[in-house]
Curated annotation (Swiss-Prot):
Gene3D superfamilies: 3.30.160.810, Translation factors. Pfam families: Ribosomal_L3. Keywords: Methylation, Ribonucleoprotein, Ribosomal protein, RNA-binding, rRNA-binding. HAMAP family: Ribosomal_uL3_B. PROSITE patterns: RIBOSOMAL_L3 (PS00474). The modification N5-methylglutamine is found at Q151. This is Large ribosomal subunit protein uL3. The gene is rplC. Belongs to the universal ribosomal protein uL3 family. Part of the 50S ribosomal subunit. Forms a cluster with proteins L14 and L19. It comes from the Bacteria. One of its GO terms (biological process) is translation.
Amino acid sequence: MSLGLVGRKCGMTRIFTEDGVSIPVTVVQVESNKVTQIKTTETDGYNAIQVTTGFKKRSNVNKPMAGHYAKASVEPGRGLWEFAIDNASDYEVGASIDATIFEAGQKVDVRGVSKGKGFQGGVKRHNFATQDATHGNSLSHRVHGSTGQNQTPGRVFKNKKMAGHLGSENVTIQSLEVVRVDAENGLLLLKGGIPGSVGGDVIVTPAVKS
């Protein structure tokens, strides 16, 4: 895994190229990511750096986490994230990582938590077809129908597509293009859409696929 950044989704807009082509982009605000811990094979069994970003009131931080931040001499952030990298020892606790690790034209992967839709039926959740609107059908227009067989096997198989909770899952969008890097304002402009609601945290890393 490569070094990445934790940012916050600001929403979508569009920018125009010099020849008038409109490009839809998602704006990701990247506040300074502070290194809170260096993990190595000798001490933790793997190499990684732990980072935090944002701000959290000290009154909302429990004592163990307050001690963790104090040990790193870093102000409490809104969470902790890790990036598994081979050269973790090249970084120091308290160091800052900003949007300049990316450049325009680079491909990145973006991970986030998809929008929660609550409990949904099979038509919306799994794109099932609806049943007949008329011809003797009553109250079953959007029912998913049979879920299994009869006495054998006498049960519903695991992973059967049925109604249930939709969204609020970890989703990765791969190979999005970095259209622009605004280091002064801490912004990344990524071509296309990314998972999650406005204000949600996203993790941006170099693309694993070219």
